[in-house]
A protein has these predicted regions:
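Short S/T/G/P-rich N-terminal loop/turn motif that feeds into the first structured element of a domain
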Residues: 1-61, 73-82
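Large eukaryotic, non-enzymatic subunits of multiprotein complexes that serve as scaffolds/tethers
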Residues: 61-67
């Protein structure tokens, strides 16, 4: 089975950004991005990119760790090599 890449995006209040970065640091396979659209809206949109053989396991663990912090829905999109 091909490895997947998971692209996860959600809203998270700026006041929780430090906690998000601390949680993400526990997952070496994840990249954490902040949407840069020139807006100062709160809450901003964050994106996680999970890659490698532990992408799905890491995504589930990170979702559990972030429970209660995210404002609204956590959107997960799956991609595989073409």
């Amino acid at each position: 089975m091909d490895e997947v890449e998971l692209y996860v995006y959600y809203k998270l209040a700026r006041r929780d950004a430090k906690r998000l970065r601390e949680i993400a640091a526990r997952f070496p396979q994840v990249r954490l991005l902040l949407k840069d659209d020139g807006s100062s809206s709160d809450p901003p949109t964050w994106m996680e990119i999970h890659t490698g053989p532990l992408a799905e396991t890491g995504e589930r663990a990170m979702a559990a760790a972030l429970e209660g912090l995210i404002a609204g829905t956590r959107h997960v999109e799956r991609f595989r090599p073409a």
